Design a protein with these regions (language model features):
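Short active-site loop/helix that positions an aromatic residue
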Residues: 49, 53-55
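Metal-dependent polysaccharide deacetylase catalytic core of the NodB/CE4 family, i.e.
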Residues: 33-36, 55-151, 180-183
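C-terminal active-site subregion of NodB/CE4 polysaccharide deacetylases
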Residues: 1-39, 44-49, 115-230
Length: 230
């Protein structure tokens, strides 16, 4: 998604009377219904100028990083051979944190966690948290589940590793299986236009939720590629 598109989304939110969350410690209970929390999964390098600009506008972005790809190309993504992109480096993350960006975990390998158990699951949760904390010198207590997929066992393991909250996508799935630990988000994609964005933000009904689920299922190409890489 191009920076001007994201900035246009910010303008749309302002036009709808929505303010933006700002702070150095995310507490969802203190966020009102008319406040938007801006999050970015994957932490691509080309997001850096945009993230810095959002900070200058008194917006605190939260960026979720897959630690195996820090400073590396997005080999986990099935389209990476056609559209290669590099993730933020450790130094870039440090500079962004100094500007006000919050860094969260997106696992180690970016693989879906819902099929993992035991040592492998703990590695994704614990090791990513520990590595990010070592890089930025701050506590990392938020995780965005890759592809928005989770199970009660994943939630239990995440909490035992010290995460305060996990972020996923579908509100119904978060309510049913999250127990208040998993927070839903409104996904925004490059294909979204003005009217679909407005519909998502003002009347997030069945059609928009269905679109989100379909796009989530289309992530299967990336999941298959990840399995091949791992």
């Amino acid at each position: 998604m191009k920076p001007r598109t994201v900035l246009g989304i910010m303008d749309l939110l302002r036009d709808l009377g929505i303010s933006f969350w700002r702070g150095d410690h995310f507490e969802p209970d203190r966020v009102t219904k008319r406040t938007a929390v801006i999050t970015f999964d994957d932490g691509y390098q080309d997001n850096y100028p945009l993230l810095a600009r959002l900070c200058s506008q008194h917006i605190t972005p939260i960026v979720f990083m897959p630690t195996a790809y820090v400073g590396r190309q997005n080999a986990w993504e099935y389209s990476s051979r056609v559209f290669p992109a590099r993730h933020l480096s450790a130094d870039e993350m440090k500079r962004l944190v100094d500007l006000g960006v919050i860094i969260g975990s997106h696992g180690v390998s970016h693989m879906s966690l819902d099929g993992m158990t035991g040592v492998r699951l703990r590695r994704e949760l614990h090791d990513s948290k520990a590595e990010l904390e070592q890089i930025i010198g701050r506590t990392v207590d938020l995780i965005s589940y890759p592809f928005g997929r989770f199970t009660p066992a994943v939630n239990e393991a995440a909490q035992s590793c010290g995460y305060r909250h996990a972020l996923a996508l579908d509100p119904e799935e978060c309510r049913a299986g999250g127990g208040g630990f998993v927070l839903p988000r409104i996904p925004i994609y490059a294909a979204d236009g003005y009217f679909s964005l407005k519909a998502k933000l003002t009347h997030p009904g069945r059609i928009e939720r269905l679109k989100g689920r379909i796009i989530g299922r289309l992530a299967g190409g990336s999941i298959i590629r990840l399995r091949a890489l791992n």
